[in-house]
């Protein structure tokens, strides 16, 4: 049985960045990814392939607490969900780490503070090529240095919109974005960034920024198409000693001194529960029964602001956000949330969600809309949880809360 110092399960922003941080210390590291490298192909930038055919989503289904099957928003590739994310890389606010009272209840404090993480935020912004501008957002936490790269310039339509917001007393700011707009960089500011894979590898995803650089070190190994079935403990159940992997139709075992599960909230939970044994009958690390509980996903709304008299010619739209209501709003003394621009919506994207609406109507809307992502916080609820069915299927129970914001 092969042996490593570290086994890292998952190659997304968590697992990939950890491998990058460990790469130069001489430790023998194995990265395990259940998928493969996402191919660079014309379909990367085709609306129908990405949004209608779901080309890059897995075929597996998860299930709600009512038993209804749904296709999860996960992407099993090297780089994980960062392969298709919108490239927004903001820091949490200082207060986010503290006890925060919401209209619907209390958001408990983290065991660490913003100040504990600030140096690591600074380093991560360098690694992920973050473009931004300090001093524009009134909720911004303290920084030890400027952003490593200047803010992404706003296109004229968006710049004019920001001026109108400022005249109303709001503080739109340049949203921190992880894209390669360095001198000689690959980014072409296209309309197929948010929600799409980047065909030219200009998005600051975990694949391009941390996994591939880590693999330049001979002590770092990547196994793709490697599904981790179980974590196996010593006979007394006190430590994990090996990982059971399904690869190329075979079941393999690999040992490690340290095993890190970084395969996402739901899949890490499922892995711990699948790994139940006589010493841990309810799953690993689950004496309290809390594994999988208090599942949170934010309260999210995609909003199109349509002016029928004013076309929006913007191509790269996702450059600004508003946090004026982050901690409270007019007549509402509780946190409300964040407004940020989406990548420019296209008619084909709308058609994938509303297939029975006339395409001419969807095209007219997309041509004249400014597209927003409106996000507020949900709160921990032990009944919102991830469980496994008797057949091993993943069940997710999530009931929205804190909706007044």
Language-model-detected regions and their locations in the chain:
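N-terminal Rossmann-like FAD-binding beta1-loop-alpha1 element of flavoenzymes
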Residues: 6-31
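Glycine-rich loop(s) and the adjacent beta-strand/alpha-helix scaffold that form part
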Residues: 24, 35-40, 217, 226, ...
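Hydrophobic or amphipathic alpha-helical targeting/insertion segments
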Residues: 31-34, 81
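Short, solvent-exposed loop/turn and secondary-structure capping segments
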Residues: 40-44, 81, 87, 96, ...
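Redox-cofactor-proximal catalytic regions of oxidoreductases
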Residues: 51-138, 375-377, 382
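Conserved redox-cofactor binding core of oxidoreductases
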Residues: 65, 101-228
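FAD cofactor-binding and catalytic pocket of flavoenzymes
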Residues: 66-73, 110-114, 288-404
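A short, glycine/Asx- and small/polar-enriched loop/turn
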Residues: 187-189, 234-241
């Amino acid at each position: 049985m092969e042996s490593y110092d570290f086994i890292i399960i998952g190659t997304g922003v968590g697992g990939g960045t950890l491998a990058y941080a460990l790469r130069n210390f001489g430790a023998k590291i194995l990265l395990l990814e259940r998928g493969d490298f996402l191919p660079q192909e014309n379909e990367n930038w085709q609306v129908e392939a990405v949004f209608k055919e779901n080309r890059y989503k897995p075929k597996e289904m998860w299930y709600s607490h009512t038993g209804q099957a749904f296709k999860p928003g996960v992407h099993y590739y090297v780089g994980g969900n960062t392969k298709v994310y919108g490239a927004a890389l903001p820091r949490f606010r200082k207060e986010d780490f503290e006890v925060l009272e919401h209209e619907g209840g209390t958001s408990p404090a983290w065991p660490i503070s913003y100040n504990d993480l600030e140096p690591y935020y600074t380093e991560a912004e360098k690694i992920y090529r973050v473009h931004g501008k300090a001093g524009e957002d009134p909720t911004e936490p303290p920084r030890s240095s400027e952003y490593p790269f200047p803010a992404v310039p706003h296109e004229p339509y968006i710049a004019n919109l920001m001026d109108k917001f400022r005249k109303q007393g709001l503080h739109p700011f340049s949203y921190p974005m992880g894209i390669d707009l360095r001198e000689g960089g690959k980014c072409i500011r296209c309309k197929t960034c948010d929600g799409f894979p980047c065909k030219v590898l200009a998005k600051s995803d975990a694949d391009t920024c941390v996994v591939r650089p880590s693999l330049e070190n001979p002590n770092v190994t990547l196994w793709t198409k490697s599904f981790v079935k179980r974590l196996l403990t010593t006979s007394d159940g006190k430590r994990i000693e090996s990982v059971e992997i399904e690869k190329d139709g075979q079941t393999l075992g690999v040992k490690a001194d340290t095993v890190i599960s970084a395969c996402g909230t739901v899949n890490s939970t499922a892995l711990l529960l699948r790994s139940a044994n006589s010493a841990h009958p309810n799953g690993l690390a689950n004496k309290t029964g809390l594994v999988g509980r208090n599942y949170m996903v934010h309260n999210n709304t995609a909003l199109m602001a349509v002016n029928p008299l004013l076309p929006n010619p913007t191509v790269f739209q996702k450059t600004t956000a508003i946090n004026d209501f982050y901690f409270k709003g007019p007549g509402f003394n509780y946190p409300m949330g964040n407004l940020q621009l989406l990548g420019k919506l296209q008619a084909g994207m709308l058609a994938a969600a509303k297939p029975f609406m006339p395409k001419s109507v969807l095209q007219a809307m997309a041509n004249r809309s400014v597209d927003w992502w409106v996000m507020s916080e949900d709160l921990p609820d032990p009944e919102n949880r991830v469980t496994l069915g008797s057949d091993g299927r993943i069940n997710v129970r999530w009931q929205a809360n804190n909706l007044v914001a």
